[in-house]
């Protein structure tokens, strides 16, 4: 990284970031390999062993150097002169190189900013992604209205590149990036379809994540600027990491650019109790006040996306609901605020009267229907939730079959221990338990009852329900830990964010 820093310091002295030559350096792709991002694309063909192949990278760089291979050929659609004959393999290597190179200047900006004393002092105000959980616990019980917003994708990837051009001044680098995306994503179309973006994001996760995070960071910077300016109380400034990428110079830039444009509209948005939470492509906007101000923010988001980022968003896709009547989905959970009503008898002198007390409680519920749908898709049960056998696993040993089912149960228990009601989680465990028994019975060509009677596997299969309690009994003191407390309390594990299949809200 010191070599990159010296290189970029020379570029800054010329008021420009020259990233283009770095694309043709072999150590860039070695850096991508060492960071373990999409490691499988650098493997040799079958028979050469699982070793990093510099030969493929050298051949690719040679083709990129040649002048005739950088000419866009509209007539030859089957053969790609830029990516060669192995389009998928080469495109993944190039995307890794682009992602590494474009992250370097921003990483150095972030490192230099963290070395400053004022930024280090503000560490206590840095908001982590894990702060979502205490936020849901502490704040949502005092809020009344919530808006569930799906952040729209840009209609064309050119928008993402244009946003990035404001911060990186290197025309040759962006010409090469456009050329790569033109061949891979069919930029000759007027509108990039969602299917094409999805395919590109799966094949080039790091590059797409960087471009998409930059787009989200841009609009959130404007939103946070307005949010801080529109509060009745002066908020203490803080810095936010938006999924690894945040640039501190943006704050001063926003004050200069947007202060004049929004100086007359800020009184319309004054709401000190508005809260904003985002994870991946979904955000939650919640407020304590009347829905009128929520509608103002809703139209603000729509106009910001349409006018500033050229992203089309329908107003009907953003709904404003009461927390006590509707639930919202975030991080794989269904959440709402439940009203608990209780009556208290009070006596004053000779008069006795009842006082009704209404308290709020946050309910975080396991999404049972989507989970059953996922289990049915994986052939553990039918669409009604009735367990079925898994014949594909019948060739494995009994121990391996039981261990596979237990691993799934562990992951589900680990993820959904933050739920306030465990009944749905136990139902999922019950489906997996019976599916495991039926799979073992199918392997031994026997009925479920005869298999259990012959093998005595009932005690072994009880691990589906007892293993989590045993683990927690080792964490908490035995005198304070009880089974009733385990059923009642929520336990958040901070590593659940790595379970992408469960976190994904789509």
Curated annotation (Swiss-Prot):
Lineage: superkingdom: Eukaryota
GO cellular component, one term: chloroplast
GO biological process entries: mRNA processing; RNA splicing; tRNA processing
UniProt record similarity statement: Belongs to the intron maturase 2 family. MatK subfamily.
A molecular-function term among this protein's GO annotations: RNA binding
InterPro entries linked to this entry: Domain_X (IPR024937), Maturase_MatK (IPR002866), Maturase_MatK_N (IPR024942)
Principal place of residence: plastid
Entry keyword RNA-binding: yes
Protein keywords: Chloroplast, mRNA processing, Plastid, RNA-binding, tRNA processing
Keyword RNA-binding annotated: yes
This protein's name: Maturase K
Function statement: Usually encoded in the trnK tRNA gene intron. Probably assists in splicing its own and other chloroplast group II introns.
Compartment annotation: Plastid, Chloroplast
Originating gene: matK
